[in-house]
């Protein structure tokens, strides 16, 4: 039996093992451990001869946690030592996990009662839903700290005077956005053409004139000019200046002289201050010759507009031997080009009037014009509206009675539970005090609403120790699966006291998972678990990895925005597919399918597909892709842009796939400096690094996963050789090199100019697992990983529990996590089944 199989059977057998007394556990340590970990030897600076059955101290809890983890991982006893009988090892693990769980339970009334604050995303979503507004609030708030990789951890979500100040500003912004200030705006459909005089002036001057041609009102782009189309920007911005709000945007576009190809273009939301666009609304594929109309919805603030930009058009023209400067004499276009006929906007779009947010705040209280605009409303937009015909404000004939009625309706939804008179009293006091000072009804009510949105009951998830009551359970479930407060259906279940019933909890879980709002869970969970939020944190060296960049004009290059977005969307669609179809979560490790578009398929060297939309495809035979570990998103966030590190990628796999956290490096460990000359591989450097005995034990775990992924470069591409810019002579001495040329083709793409790198030393993706099994490359490594389905399932369960509850799991939770993983295993490790197992567990339903 291999050591890996022994380890897997050991873990599965732990659940069946009878829990021994401490004397039995102690005999195991004396027989198999004390030779290396007694008072005299203390290998790894770890001593076991003083261990007792009492785990009250932090050191004792940590030491027993370490023993359980290392025995479970197969790290101990060391490979050269005889394995203890499996039954004995199972008994020790059973004792250790039981003792750790018992100690964790005794702590429950102490450190585990910390209240969790809403993080920035949850605050924004909750306020937007409560007031039915589409206003950005997250960026107004301080960045949340993370713990165990998640920004939902209660211990990391502190609050400071700065937070309070920013919450007040955010509350004011949201409340003003919810207010109805005038009659319902007329829904206008307006079409903007490129024959506007300002556009004509623009096209007759400036350095980009040679790359764009206007013919019969259609502008034709022959290059990625980076132009932000000032006429469209100015015309549309002047429109949104008068009427900010939700709009439907349509763009009519086509590909000219296509010859079977189509041009992809992006639509971004932009403003005068950010002319290059700050939010990509979508990517679209312009069909050949006959225009198509593309439609999106977005919310425009004042003066905002859109930017249209062709994608990789320079490459397409160059591959056809075409210049980016077409004739300017009005003759037919030469070569492939993007034609934009018009841009149309429809809006502002409102479902009802007064808006839902206004009704939530002021109900049916009559609206009357201000006689004079109060100071808190003196803004350019409202001043202009007031001068044109007045700005409306709620006016109550019975302000105190209306205030109580409105607050009684608003407060339970804000608090996410029923409220008492005592809950209501401080807000009524705010209103009464303002009214006594002769402030208007609106100002008094907005002051009370702002206080609600900054109150601890709103900002924190209030949960008493022990089993969660139905309203606390509703909040935990909703913030887990929808990333916002409970909706009416869920809140009504809690009001009736039904949610704790297993069948009702399962039904509501299914409803939320089937809702479009579950996309918020997928996006945020993967952003944190897989580190997708760091996708823009590094930039691959453009001279070494030119495939990752696109030409913007001349010698200017920029990161390929479509490939970055495609990386992230591939991971999200992959996870969503598993979740919605209850497919085995083990396909997160390896699969024979993924999601790609034309750009991603080319980047992965897969059979071509057409268009910018991602779709599910089967991987070709022999593909090195499959599962999340070999997706471009994960490979990019685990590299620094210049080089890869087996240590970084290895730690990522251990922590996020296997749930094993290596010990921090000792102070004398030193660091590994990159060899930019390429004359020494990272494996050779690590071999020297491991000569430090205190480093070697951890690197035996860390390095193998990292070595398996060395066949992928910092941009996420497959490679057989390292790329280098320097040290050519030293490399040649070890491996003959081809001569550098002035033009080379990299995976189908021409890179113009002098060669900026040479193939370096060959990549070695071989390695040995801690348990002795050998592998060559990522595919063999993934097959070895899949021999530990329980560990993989338990790790993901722990990540979900941490994300959902705001509390990091530890060794005291291993028994509960083992039970969750075993439950999912009876349902073929289905991802949806795992979600249900997590939600019905005590870890989720208890504080």
Task: Name what the model sees in each region.
Residues 1-9:
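Sec-dependent signal peptide recognition
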């Amino acid at each position: 039996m291999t050591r890996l199989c022994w380890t897997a059977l050991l873990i599965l057998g732990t659940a069946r093992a009878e829990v021994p007394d401490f004397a039995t556990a102690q005999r195991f340590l004396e027989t198999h451990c004390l030779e290396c970990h007694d008072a005299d030897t203390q290998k790894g600076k770890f001593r076991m001869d003083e261990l007792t059955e009492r785990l009250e101290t932090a050191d004792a809890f940590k030491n027993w946690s370490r023993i359980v983890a290392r025995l479970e991982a197969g790290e101990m006893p060391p490979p050269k030592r005889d394995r203890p009988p499996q039954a004995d090892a199972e008994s020790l693990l059973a004792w250790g996990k039981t003792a750790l769980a018992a100690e964790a339970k005794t702590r429950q009334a102490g450190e585990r009662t910390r209240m969790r604050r809403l993080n920035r995303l949850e605050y924004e979503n909750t306020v937007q839903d409560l007031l039915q507004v589409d206003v950005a609030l997250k960026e107004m708030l301080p960045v949340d700290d993370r713990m165990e990789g998640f920004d939902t951890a209660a211990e990391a979500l502190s609050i400071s005077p700065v937070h309070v100040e920013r919450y007040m500003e955010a509350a004011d912004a949201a409340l003003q956005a919810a207010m109805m200030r005038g009659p319902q705006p007329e829904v206008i459909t307006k079409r903007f053409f490129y024959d506007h005089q300002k556009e004509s002036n623009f096209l007759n001057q400036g350095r980009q004139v040679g790359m764009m041609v206007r013919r019969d009102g259609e502008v034709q782009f022959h290059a990625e000019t980076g132009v932000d189309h000032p006429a469209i920007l100015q015309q549309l911005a002047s429109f949104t200046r008068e009427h900010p709000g939700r709009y439907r945007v349509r763009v009519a576009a086509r590909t000219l002289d296509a010859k079977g190809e189509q041009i992809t273009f992006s639509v971004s939301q932009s403003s005068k201050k950010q002319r290059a666009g700050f939010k990509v609304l979508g990517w679209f594929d312009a069909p050949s010759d006959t225009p198509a109309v593309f439609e999106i919805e977005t919310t425009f603030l004042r003066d905002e507009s859109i930017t249209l930009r062709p994608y990789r058009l320079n490459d397409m023209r160059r591959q056809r031997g075409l210049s980016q400067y077409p004739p300017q004499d009005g003759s037919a276009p030469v070569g492939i080009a993007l034609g934009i006929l018009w841009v149309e906007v429809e809006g502002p779009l409102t479902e009802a009037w007064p808006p839902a947010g206004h009704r939530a705040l002021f109900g049916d209280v009559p609206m009357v014009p201000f006689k004079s605009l109060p100071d808190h409303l003196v803004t350019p937009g409202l001043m202009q509206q007031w001068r044109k015909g007045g700005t409306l404000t709620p006016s109550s004939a019975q302000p105190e009675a209306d205030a109580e009625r409105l607050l009684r309706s608003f407060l339970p939804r804000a608090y996410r539970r029923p409220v008492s008179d005592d809950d209501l009293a401080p807000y009524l006091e705010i209103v009464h005090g303002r009214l006594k000072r002769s402030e208007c009804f609106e100002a008094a009510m907005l002051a009370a609403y702002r206080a609600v949105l900054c109150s601890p009951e709103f900002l924190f998830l209030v949960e008493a120790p022990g089993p969660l009551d139905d309203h606390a359970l509703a909040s935990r479930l909703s913030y887990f699966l929808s990333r916002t407060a409970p909706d009416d259906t869920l809140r009504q279940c809690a009001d009736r006291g039904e949610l704790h019933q297993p069948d009702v909890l399962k039904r509501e879980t299914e409803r939320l998972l089937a809702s479009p709002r579950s996309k918020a869970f997928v996006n945020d969970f993967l952003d944190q678990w897989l580190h997708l939020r760091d996708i823009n944190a590094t930039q691959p060296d453009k001279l070494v990895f030119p495939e990752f960049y696109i030409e913007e004009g001349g010698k200017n290059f920029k990161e390929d925005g479509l490939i970055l977005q495609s990386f992230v969307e591939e991971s999200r669609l992959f996870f969503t597919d598993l979740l919605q179809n209850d497919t085995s979560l083990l396909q997160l490790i390896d699969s024979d399918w993924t999601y790609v578009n034309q750009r991603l398929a080319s980047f992965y060297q897969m059979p071509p597909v057409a268009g910018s939309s991602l779709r599910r495809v089967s991987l070709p035979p022999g593909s090195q892709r499959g599962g999340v570990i070999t997706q471009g998103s994960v490979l990019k966030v685990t590299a620094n842009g210049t080089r890869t590190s087996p240590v970084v990628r290895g730690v990522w796999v251990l922590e996020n796939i296997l749930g094993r956290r290596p010990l921090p490096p000792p102070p004398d460990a030193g660091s590994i400096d990159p060899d930019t000359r390429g004359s020494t591989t990272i494996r050779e450097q690590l071999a020297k690094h491991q000569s430090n005995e205190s480093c070697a034990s951890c690197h035996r775990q860390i390095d193998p996963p990292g070595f398996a992924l060395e066949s992928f470069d910092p941009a996420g591409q497959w490679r057989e050789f390292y790329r280098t810019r320097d040290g050519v002579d030293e490399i040649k001495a070890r491996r003959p090199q081809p001569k550098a040329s002035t033009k080379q083709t990299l995976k189908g793409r021409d890179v113009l100019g002098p060669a900026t790198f040479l193939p370096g030393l060959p990549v070695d993706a071989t390695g040995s697992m801690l348990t002795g099994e050998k592998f060559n490359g990522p595919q063999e490594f993934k097959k070895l990983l899949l021999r530990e389905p329980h560990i993989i399932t338990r790790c993901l369960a722990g990540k979900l529990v941490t994300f959902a509850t705001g509390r990091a799991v530890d060794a005291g939770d291993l028994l509960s996590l083992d039970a969750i993983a075993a439950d999912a295993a009876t349902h073929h490790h289905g991802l949806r089944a795992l979600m249900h197992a997590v939600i019905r567990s005590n870890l989720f339903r208890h504080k």
